[in-house]
């Protein structure tokens, strides 16, 4: 299968304002005594600023799979359709935990496993994990003339042969899952159609699923996050009524695109802030693909990059899922997978953080 090439932004770093501090210039002895009594009373009453346990009722995920007290951790693990479970288990062994979300791709071909949402392997993996299915309006082994266009999808031309069939499979699966239609669609216009045609196609699939009684889809709109495409993003957004989560895919490409080395914070912050200011102030956000190239001249660089992940995700308001991309992109220097044991150990430590260990749906 062919995976999309991802543009990269020149994202600036994070600039955080210091918290305001109040200074007390004069306090009488009597007032100080009152304050001390109040502090002691608070301590004795058990008041605490500590975060609630992931097992507490207030931290249970919502119907739209939003963890209330932290974030999910997931990954795209390199696989072919028949060996998904084996490769997921091998990845989990190295990071020391079960993935919350497993990320897979599908096209709209009419035969074989590539066009079949929820393969037997995905259903096996999905017993203990959530799934993010990336559904692309492509036929990876087809000719240019066979590639679906957004206008065709919007007009219902693929309903009987593709849309209805896959809707039925998802409905039969029953469990909630994340579904993305044409992730990184900002790289596919005008080849697949106009932004307006994409929106019409997305809405048609959404509405068709609803007509067919499919209620277990969490609709996930995923863009590159490349800030140079900001005007495209505005025109490609299907609207709040059609989107449950917003995702974006940003990397430290480094030598892959002859870019400067960027920290995890630098790769994520500009896109996050732009989405919050221009697309949605309240939708849950997903770092649907993140990762970094290696730096052979500094073997510790990749490990140090992953060390930042928990700290940065916690301060990116509204980010409730982060998925590591453990594969390569096309081109020289574009291997974004974990390169050495030190990198694996760093990621293992990062995803052991309690923030990434929330109670799953149905637990």
Predicted regions and their residues:
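N-terminal substrate-binding region of glycoside hydrolase catalytic domains
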Residues: 59, 64-158, 292, 324
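Aromatic- and acid-rich polysaccharide-binding/catalytic face
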Residues: 99-107, 133, 233-263, 325
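Acidic (Asp/Glu)-rich catalytic clusters
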Residues: 89-97, 115-133, 165-174, 235-241, ...
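Aromatic-lined carbohydrate-recognition surfaces of secreted/lumenal glycan-active proteins
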Residues: 76-77, 182, 206-231, 282-295, ...
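Glycoside hydrolase catalytic-domain groove-lining segments
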Residues: 117-136, 251-293
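Substrate-binding cleft of secreted/luminal carbohydrate-active enzymes
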Residues: 56, 62-79, 177, 284-363
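C-terminal region of N-terminal signal peptides and the immediate post-cleavage residues
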Residues: 37-59
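Substrate-binding cleft of extracellular glycoside hydrolase catalytic domains
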Residues: 111-221
């Amino acid at each position: 299968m062919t995976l999309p090439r991802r543009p990269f932004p020149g994202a600036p770093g994070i600039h955080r304002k210091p918290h305001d501090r109040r200074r007390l210039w004069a306090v009488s002895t009597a007032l100080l005594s009152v304050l001390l009594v109040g502090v002691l009373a608070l301590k004795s009453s058990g008041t605490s600023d500590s975060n609630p346990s992931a097992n507490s009722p207030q931290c249970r995920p919502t119907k739209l799979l939003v963890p209330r007290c932290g974030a999910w951790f997931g990954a795209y693990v390199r696989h072919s359709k028949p060996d998904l479970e084996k490769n997921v288990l091998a990845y989990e062994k190295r990071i020391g935990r079960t993935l919350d979300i497993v990320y897979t791709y599908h096209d709209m071909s009419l035969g074989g496993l590539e066009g079949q949402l929820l393969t037997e392997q995905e259903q096996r993996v999905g017993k203990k994990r959530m799934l993010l299915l990336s559904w692309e309006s492509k036929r990876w082994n087809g000719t240019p003339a066979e590639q679906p266009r957004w206008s065709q999808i919007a007009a219902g031309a693929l309903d009987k042969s593709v849309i209805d069939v896959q809707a039925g499979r998802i409905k039969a699966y029953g469990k909630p899952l994340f579904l993305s239609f044409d992730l990184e669609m900002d790289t596919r216009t005008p080849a697949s159609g106009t932004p307006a045609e994409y929106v019409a196609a997305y809405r048609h699939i959404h509405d068709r699923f609803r007509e067919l009684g499919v209620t277990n889809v969490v609709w996930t709109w995923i863009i590159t996050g490349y800030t140079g495409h900001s005007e495209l993003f505005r025109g490609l957004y299907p609207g709040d009524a059609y989107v449950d989560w917003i995702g974006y895919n940003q990397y430290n490409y480094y030598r892959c695109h002859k870019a400067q080395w960027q920290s995890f914070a630098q790769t994520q912050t500009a896109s996050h802030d732009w989405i919050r200011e221009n697309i949605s102030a309240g939708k849950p956000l997903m770092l649907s693909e993140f990762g970094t190239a290696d730096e052979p001249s500094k073997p510790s660089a990749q490990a140090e990059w992953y060390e930042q992940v928990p700290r940065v995700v916690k301060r990116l308001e509204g980010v409730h899922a982060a998925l590591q991309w453990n594969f390569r992109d096309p081109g020289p220097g574009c291997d974004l997978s974990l390169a050495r044991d030190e990198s694996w150990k760093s990621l293992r430590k990062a995803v052991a953080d309690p923030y990434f260990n929330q109670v799953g749906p149905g637990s």
